[in-house]
Amino acid sequence: MKDLSRLAAFRAELARRKLTGFIIPRQDEFQGEYVAPYAERLRWLTGFAGSWGTAIVTLRKAAIFVDGRYTLQVRQQVDTQAFETLHLVDEPPTKWIEKNLRKGNTLGFDPWLLTANEADRFAAACTKVGAKLVPITSNPIDAIWKEQPGRPTASVATQPTQFAGRSAADKLKDLAGSMDADAAVLTMPDSIAWSFNIRGQDVPYTPVALAYAILHRKGKAELFIDVAKLPEDVQAHLRPIAIVREPAEIEPSLKALGRKKAQVRIDPSSAPSRIRDILKKAGARVVHGTDPCLLPKAKKNSIEQEGARVAHVRDGVAMARFLYWFDREAPNGGLTELSVATKLAQLREATGMLMDLSFNTIAGAGPNGASPHYAVTTESNQPLKQGELFLIDSGAQYQDGTTDVTRTLPVGEPTEEMRDRFTRVLKGMIAISRIRFPEGTCGSQLDVLARASLWRSGFDYDHGTGHGVGSYLSVHEGPARINKSDRTPLEPGMILSNEPGFYKPDSFGIRIENLVLVHEAKAINGGDRKMLGFETLTLCPIDRRLIDLSLLTREESEWLDNYHARVLKEVGDRLDGAELKWLRQACAPLD
């Protein structure tokens, strides 16, 4: 964003309120990855369109902080004369506060938009320099955003047990029985969608309704949601299991818990600090704990697992048709990032089962592929050129499962450098796919396997290797991940991505991604530990033109041949004619 009039108006509003500065996070009141248009405050002020970031604006300075996924994108979208663009690890917001605020300064924040943990960290940083962190419930951006969109109004639907695998009544009973408090406040819409077996359309790509809930150890749950969005069948579904209230009633209900001196559990990593403040001020005994839905939601039941398999076969057919089309059209020229992304979306739509995409397709041609979470726009849209690589990361929401797949494709003849880097990324992906590991193993213990071949050549990538994936829910789901620091044990039923990458700035990007399901593995002869492993769900050919066979071991080549044989069998049975002929060639054994 090069128009700085919004920044000037925002500073004028801060001065009017006698604030030194203000924190602007990407999050909304529900801390999800995707937000409704009304909550795109960070984008409106700065121009940054990524899914994670935080800005701090004072009367004289401004900075925006992003992680490694967005270091290139933020410089392209934000006026770097007006905003410092900083890496959150190298220069976190708290350190910036300590450097730039002084004694007596007041730093404002919206307590619905920062979690309890985040507010504590910012408060500690302010205290260090004698400044004060001040909650402001009337967001100053909302005061100057004259054309701010309204709140979402789309209808809510039920998620039938034929897809959910368990009734909402059973889930809520289990949650109440496992509670170590009188009540627990749920603030994450995907947790609420899972536990109540409902789905919504309030944010892009993730089928959730924006809502809060209070679970009680004794008595019905309370669900705080816009009742106008609930058709009669959904109200009938909820009536036996919940008291439905309007969103504005959350504060009175929290205060009622306080008057009872109830012990109330919140997750400080996701609950807005405002909720904690209301509870404490009202007299509740607040206890911190993880969202009680996180682990049971992540451990898919047998119905959800089978749904994921069916969804990935369906998605594999769409991907095969897309890759066949791409191989025919790319040599002719005329393709652009947007036209390719649109074609893939059309092929998924043609399945007749698509509910939505699971995220905004990342379609990066040449240098744009070097930005791991590049978001193509009409302004940035680039043609696909001969001699470049094209990275496409996409996914779908089907009622029986969520998909996420990345493939890197050559446009013309790849260079030796491209083939070397691609093969090293492939080796990492195969290493994760093949590993068997003992119960209790965390993603951080496996992460090195994906990076080892790149490390041997002095390379790495600045993102995690894998994230959890929901069941017709968020494509990025906790609590388990595969990265350098995660400490959550992997358990059967969890679905994660397996996506190592390599990025050469201003040149090209490479990523290969499959989804995998954690399952109990066969015992190892002579071993005494119960072992787990991964079942690969994604069914999509990996481009052999980018593979340097001399870098693959016999075991790696065998894995890839077996994988392609499975793709051909499960996807090929649903293709015919030229598309099937193409798939047979794409899945042929390596020479």
Describe the residue ranges of each PLM region.
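Active-site neighborhoods and metal-handling regions in enzymes and metal-associated proteins
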Residues: M1-D591
